[in-house]
Amino acid sequence: MPTYAVTYHYTATPEHLAEVRPIHRAWLAERLAEGTLLASGPMVDTPTSLLIWRADSLKQVAETLDNDPFDIAGCIGERVIQEWNPIFGPWS
């Protein structure tokens, strides 16, 4: 199954992000439990985050991410989805 790297670029205020973050993290925990989300977390000192997904297609990742509470709440200004080919490590 292909692996995808997703970058979120946030445009929401820190206060709005903090308000939505608990339901966003609960949603991510559900994706982790089902095995589609492999890892996620914020980048340091920049309003971006990286998420690693397993899915059958880029379209499937995009459709899943459309249901992310951060996306629904308008926190994400840009979302970049790229197929990733991990050569080394636990996901290769």
Language-model features: where?
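Conserved, structured core segments of small domains
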Residues: 1-92
